[in-house]
């Protein structure tokens, strides 16, 4: 039907009908005369319709150039940072959408925009300039950013939303630029093989695409103009002779260019940008060849400059994902080889620390971690007093370098450096500063991950070593006699064992191979066996432990009954169970020194003189060894299940508060491991209610806290509880305890008041029965709450004590 319409037709109605697909007869008067008459006005004067369109088109000047063959560009470390870090952060921001493309004054109805703003700029243009290596220096790119923000502030009112959005983006821009490399260095870009051939093909392709995209810029809005380009567009696209080079998304985008060109676009440069993005994603997952096709940034770029720029872009993409490569290129080859050969295996805990470091440096936390990526440049930031206040600067890049060079021997050193970095920030900046809030946020991330630190495989080593010992040795060590020489020598042996275990932990963290670890384990096992043999030799003679245990359990069940039977029965009970008493303090010391690792085999420790419900929390108050710690429980089961008194819980709470920061993670781990209800709770917000914790959990915490606090000042903590108590005070305390005990006995057995006194005199008459007195005083410690005393019983007690 189109053949009926000629360009020189003088019958607009007939031409109109022809365009609608109607025959010439439809143009005659009839029922359908109204349809053609409606469109008649549009075709009455084609030139009149095209004039306003031609007047509107120049309202949007051509967008800024994104490539210039006459102006050389290059790739520098600063430009790469602006492209990969700054632009990426700004482009993804929720306020970035108005700045991603040039201002379309026609579409937005801003006729005076280009009269006021003489140099338009947008992030899309800057991004494409960076991709095309348009800039020679980073300052040119930063100037474009500043121009974009300034244009926004000049044209809009200060209260407009767009101004607030621009201010937010500018703040982020300045923050990112603050951590940009200080010295600008040109990066060497390697040119891949065959890039020139493909660059030439790209030039031909780009030329054809350019011609296709230039059509709508010249075309009119008139209907006749809309129908003239379509026959040319498919021929332009189909003339591309290299389908092997072009990826399928590009072909699809080119074929879809036809219908897109029919519509008048308000911003023509946006279309090539969208196509280029699609192919670039394809290129990222395949080979550098399609990337070379994508390199040119705009339709207006001449073919001559496309070869070099297409060849230079792919290496930049590869390097952008490896921020640690550029510094390494400055190192000599020998140094690089030395670094790689020097590295050994990381321990499990250091591997966990390395994972924490990677997370802190990840994009996930970049919004608040970026100030800590690199050392503080005091001169560049104008912080002239920084190094006067901060004596030991620290940053994440330094921590990473030390981790790569294996400078950290254990996780504590790593944590100390990270915490030093945060403390420097808190020390130098005011509390309400933005960087302090960022530091707190990042430290929360660090502490949360660090609290999940796994146990070192060899850290609980003493436990299997101890359980592998012959039963006789372990039993004899827990059942030795009460001689002073044996207790002194055993305490020395415990200190030696503590040192050995500390050395073992250090060695295990720095060990390089499984063979060395096994060898050290064997050596330490032999040393432990030798120590136990010495302890066995020092003891008077071991008694069989199974029988001992049964006796102790029976005594525990009959404790209350024996209490009612009188003092004599208690003395007999004490004589029967006094043999293992002196070695228990020693073993508790060892168990607490090793962090609770060997407590299960070597005897559980007792802590605190004030007892809860048990009667086996003795305080060693003999004149021969006053500084000895209260210790000792009859068996492991009793120790684990013995509830804590209020005073002990209070002391434990105070001790936990004294722990350094790096030790608190282990406290949380102990609680979560032993309390199923808290296993899934957040370590950052965990609340420790001592009333709800199991006794075994509290005892384990007590052992760990004591081991942590005792390792630093070894002896001050062992005499912590008796601090300030002289021998006289201890004697008075013992008198009060005996007095209370005698009151209980006299209240129940009035007729047998004298025998306890004689028994106590007998007990004090020999050195072997001194233990019974301490045993008795310890067993009476549970009745500290009663404070009444009588003068007669006090005199009896003083006689027995002086005896």
Curated annotation (Swiss-Prot):
One of its GO terms (cellular component) is cytoplasm. The modification N-acetylmethionine is found at residue 1. Residues 285-298, 777-797 have a biased composition (Low complexity). A protein binds at residues 112, 155-157, 160-161. Pfam families: BET (PF17035), Bromodomain (PF00439). Residues 481-515 have a biased composition (Acidic residues). Keywords: Acetylation, Bromodomain, Chromatin regulator, Chromosome, Nucleus, Phosphoprotein, Repeat, Transcription, Transcription regulation. The modification Phosphoserine is found at residues 37, 298, 301, 305, 635. Residues 1-28, 53-73, 268-349, 456-653, 739-803 are annotated as: Disordered. GO terms for biological process: chromatin looping; chromatin remodeling; neural tube closure; nucleosome assembly; positive regulation of T-helper 17 cell lineage commitment; protein localization to chromatin; regulation of DNA-templated transcription; regulation of transcription by RNA polymerase II. Its main location: nucleus. Belongs to the BET family. This is Bromodomain-containing protein 2. The gene is BRD2.
């Amino acid at each position: 039907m189109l053949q009926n319409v000629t360009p020189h037709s003088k019958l607009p109605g007939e031409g109109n009908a022809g365009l609608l697909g109607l025959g010439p007869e439809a143009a005659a008067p009839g029922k359908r005369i109204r349809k053609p008459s409606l469109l008649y006005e549009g075709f009455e004067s084609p030139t009149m319709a095209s004039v306003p369109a031609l007047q509107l088109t120049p309202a949007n000047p051509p967008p800024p150039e994104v490539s210039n063959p006459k102006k050389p560009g290059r790739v520098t470390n600063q430009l790469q940072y602006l492209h990969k870090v700054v632009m990426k952060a700004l482009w993804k921001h929720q306020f970035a959408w108005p700045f991603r493309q040039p201002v379309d004054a026609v579409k937005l109805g801003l006729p005076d925009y280009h009269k006021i703003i003489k140099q338009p700029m947008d992030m899309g243009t800057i991004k494409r300039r960076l991709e095309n290596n348009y800039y020679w220096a980073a300052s040119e790119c930063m100037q474009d950013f500043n121009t974009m923000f300034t244009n926004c502030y000049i044209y809009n009112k200060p209260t407009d939303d767009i101004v607030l959005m621009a201010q937010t983006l500018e703040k982020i821009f300045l923050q990112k630029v603050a951590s940009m490399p200080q010295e600008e260095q040109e990066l060497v870009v390697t040119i891949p093989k065959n890039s020139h051939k493909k660059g030439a093909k790209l030039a031909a392709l780009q030329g054809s695409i350019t011609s296709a995209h230039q059509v709508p810029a010249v075309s009119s809005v008139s209907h006749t103009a809309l129908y003239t380009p379509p026959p040319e567009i498919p021929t332009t696209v189909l003339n591309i002779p290299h389908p092997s080079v072009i990826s399928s998304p590009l072909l699809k985008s080119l074929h879809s260019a036809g219908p897109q060109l029919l519509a008048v676009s308000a911003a023509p440069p946006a279309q090539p940008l969208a196509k280029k993005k699609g192919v670039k994603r394809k290129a990222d997952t395949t080979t550098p060849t399609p990337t070379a096709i994508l390199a040119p940034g705009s339709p207006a770029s001449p073919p001559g400059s496309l070869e070099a720029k297409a060849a230079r872009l792919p290496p930049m993409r590869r390097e952008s994902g490896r921020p640690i490569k550029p510094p390494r290129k400055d190192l000599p080859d020998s140094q690089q080889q030395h670094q790689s050969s020097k590295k050994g295996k990381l321990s499990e805990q250091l591997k966990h620390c390395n994972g924490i470091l990677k997370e802190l440096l990840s994009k996930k936390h970049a919004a608040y971690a970026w100030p800590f990526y690199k050392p503080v440049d005091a001169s560049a930031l104008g912080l002239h007093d920084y190094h006067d206040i901060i004596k030991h600067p620290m940053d994440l890049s330094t921590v990473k370098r030390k981790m790569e060079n294996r400078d950290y021997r254990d996780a504590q050193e790593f944590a100390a450096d990270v915490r030093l970095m945060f403390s420097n920030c808190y020390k130098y900046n005011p509390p309400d500063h933005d960087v302090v809030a960022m530091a707190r946020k990042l430290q929360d991330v660090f502490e949360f991950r660090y609290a999940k630190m796994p146990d070192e495989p060899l850290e609980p080593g003493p436990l299997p070593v101890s359980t592998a010992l012959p039963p006789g040795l372990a039993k004899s060590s827990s059942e030795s006699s009460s001689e002073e020489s044996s207790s002194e020598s055993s305490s020395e042996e415990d200190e030696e064992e503590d040192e050995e275990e500390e050395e073992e932990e250090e060695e295990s963290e720095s060990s390089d191979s499984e063979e060395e670890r096994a060898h050290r384990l064997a050596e330490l096992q032999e040393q432990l066996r030798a120590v136990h043999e010495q302890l066995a030799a020092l003891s008077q003679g071991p008694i069989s432990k199974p029988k001992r245990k049964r006796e102790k359990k029976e005594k525990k069940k009959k404790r209350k009954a024996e209490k009612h039977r009188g003092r004599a029965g208690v003395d007999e009970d004490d004589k029967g169970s006094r043999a293992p008493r002196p070695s228990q303090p020693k073993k508790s010391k060892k168990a607490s020194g090793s962090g609770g690792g060997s407590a299960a085999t070597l005897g559980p420790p007792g802590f605190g003189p004030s007892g809860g419900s048990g009667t086996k929390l003795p305080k060693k108050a003999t004149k021969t060894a006053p500084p000895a710690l209260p210790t000792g429980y009859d068996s492991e089961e009793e120790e684990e299940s013995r509830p804590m008194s209020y005073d002990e819980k209070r002391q434990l709470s105070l001790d936990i508060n004294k722990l350094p920061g790096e030790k608190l993670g282990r406290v949380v781990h102990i609680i979560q491991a032993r309390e199923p209800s808290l296993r899934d709770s957040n370590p950052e917000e965990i609340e420790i209610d001592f009333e709800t914790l199991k006794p075994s959990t509290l005892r384990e915490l007590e052992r760990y806290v004591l081991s942590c606090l005792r390792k630093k000042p070894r002896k001050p903590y062992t005499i912590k509880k008796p601090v300030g108590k002289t021998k006289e005070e201890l004697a008075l305390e013992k008198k009060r305890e005996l007095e209370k005990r005698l009151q209980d006995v006299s209240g129940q057995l009035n007729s047998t008041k004298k025998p306890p006194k004689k028994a106590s005199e007998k007990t004090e008459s020999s050195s072997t029965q001194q233990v019974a007195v301490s045993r008795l005083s310890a067993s009476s410690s549970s009745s500290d709450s009663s404070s009444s005393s009588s003068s007669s019983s006090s005199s009896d007690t003083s006689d027995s004590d002086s005896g």
